[in-house]
Amino acid sequence: MSSDLTAYVRSNRERYEQEFGDFLRIPSVSTEKRYADDVSRCAEWLADIVREAGMDNVEIIPTEGNPFVVADKIVDPDAPTVLVYGHYDVQPVDP
């Protein structure tokens, strides 16, 4: 890791930990209907974070189930594409 990146991460560590804690406190249990509003709130939270991170286009796509969050940043349309996939929901304690 470059020294500039290391310094940046270290200087923002508390903020990152706070944001991650905020994220983890949202009970986004996707398999239980009673948490549907929380799953949507979590999608909104995630969309806000990726907007703040500089994504150009951020969209929350509703589905019959839980919403998708899709974001992109096109730096150079001729450059290779990098895809990052993850999930923001959690599973119940006793699946």
Describe each PLM feature range:
Residues 2-95:
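Acidic/His- and Gly-rich active-site-bordering loop/insert found
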